[in-house]
């Protein structure tokens, strides 16, 4: 299975030890604060300062989440009403559209293409009727394509959001996978006026099943999200918070060793992609290889089905992420080297 981006590697031992020791605390099994432990929020604030040079107030500008995915729903409930419109990338994470529909708002897809480096076409966006658009989803580093984005792009996006009074949300869980220059939209001057950012410990620290993420932004936006969240759960489990605190303290050597594993796997996946006649961007970042199928292939899904039934290998068809994913397939790096080599061998 080369489809799902669920890290198969273990967290650092210090993370597991911190959780184990937390079980001995007398309040470990009680309800926890909706805002999380102050120590966790401070750890997240320090993480943003160290890696992105972004200053955040730990009391008002950051909110721990049970995974950043729940933040997508919280944000929709906090800021959207029936009939509002939301700009959603095509291709992009399917949950953006699903959540918009759940709150009876309207998804408006905007095109991302290889010709434009998988970045928004601002000229095309400005031609749209934006009067009902309340929110815009972006995701850089981009999933599924691995486009890194840039501070210059973020500046354009912040200017666009200010001009049209749109709340901009950057979904940013892939900053630290095979990416030498992690960036945050909150690095841009004035971004806090119009932007929120979601982040996650899932891919960064191999903790997908722990469900730890965060949303960052100005106090007014965070308070609106908290009003929703406080009616959805009763706080994050204490032991998980303690483990997350330990993870956030890890040195940069953690990312270096992780990248060594992923770089080796990626090189093997490049070989597999070449066997399938695909082309790809070797400079893409993140947890996936986004590969373009040969021009002779008319359907990504049909191509994948044939491989699934004949070789017993699953690869994600690009169409899962939108119509602009047609002609592409996505490999996950969350597959052991031996299994990738086995997959390569099945093609002779």
What are these regions (language model features)?
Residues 190-263, 267-271:
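Conserved core segment of the aminotransferase class I/II
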Residues 245, 261-270, 280-292, 325:
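Conserved glycine-rich beta-strand-loop-beta hairpin in the small C-terminal domain of fold type I
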Residues 46, 54, 126, 297, ...:
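PLP-dependent enzyme catalytic core of the Aspartate aminotransferase-like
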Residues 103, 163-164, 276, 311:
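Helix C-cap/helix->beta junction micro-motif
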Residues 78-100:
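Conserved PLP-anchoring active-site segment centered on the Schiff-base-forming lysine
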Residues 84, 105, 163-167, 191-193:
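A short helix->loop->beta-strand "cap" motif at the edges of active sites that frequently abuts
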Residues 108, 112-183:
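Active-site phosphate-binding strand-loop segment of PLP-dependent enzymes
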Residues 1-66, 74, 248-250:
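N-terminal small-domain helix-loop-helix segment of the aminotransferase-like
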